[in-house]
Amino acid sequence: MSDLTHLDESGRARMVDVGAKDDTLREAVARGEVRMRPETLQRLAAGDMPKGDVLATARIAGIMAAKRAPDLIPLCHPLLLTHVAVDARLDVATSTVQIEATVRTVGKTGVEMEALTAVSVAALTIYDMCKAIDREMQIGAIRLVRKSGGRSGDFVND
């Protein structure tokens, strides 16, 4: 269990002490998608959704979620985020909304959970705003695609 930093010697969950770590620039990029019927995607593209501007609302929800990650994930450190961007674009070929979140900070720990939370909540928002016309939607492929900064170095999973 020594590789699992969120567990103490007895195997109990604990918050990692990052106090002695140096502040460095940290960035994480996460992606995910919402798959829907082609007719739903067409209505989304046309702005013809009963609940309003779905993509704008999803972007704002994702940004808000990144800032609230420590409230949702028990051992996640509260961080001063210096940048959060959430993009949602329509992919007609796959009948999906592709979501990407980029999060940055200068701090002692990474922002992977914030980026993943942003994508997840943006996807849930899209689902919520479209479910009245498409209950078959699927949220998926949520993953960390890139991170930089910190002792563990860079990670790329594109």
UniProtKB/Swiss-Prot annotation:
* EC assignment: 4.6.1.17
Q: What does this protein do?
A: Catalyzes the conversion of (8S)-3',8-cyclo-7,8-dihydroguanosine 5'-triphosphate to cyclic pyranopterin monophosphate (cPMP).
User: Does the keyword Lyase belong to this entry?
Assistant: yes
Q: Which reaction does it catalyse?
A: (8S)-3',8-cyclo-7,8-dihydroguanosine 5'-triphosphate = cyclic pyranopterin phosphate + diphosphate
Q: What InterPro entries does the entry give?
A: MoaC, MoaC_bact/euk, MoaC_sf, MoCo_biosynth_MoaA/MoaC, Mopterin_CF_biosynth-C_dom
Active site positions, chain numbering: D128
Protein name listed in UniProt: Cyclic pyranopterin monophosphate synthase
Q: Which CDD domains does the UniProt entry name for this protein?
A: MoaC_PE
| Record keywords, A-Z | Lyase, Molybdenum cofactor biosynthesis
- Residues noted as binding substrate in the record, renumbered to the chain: L75, C76, H77, M113, E114
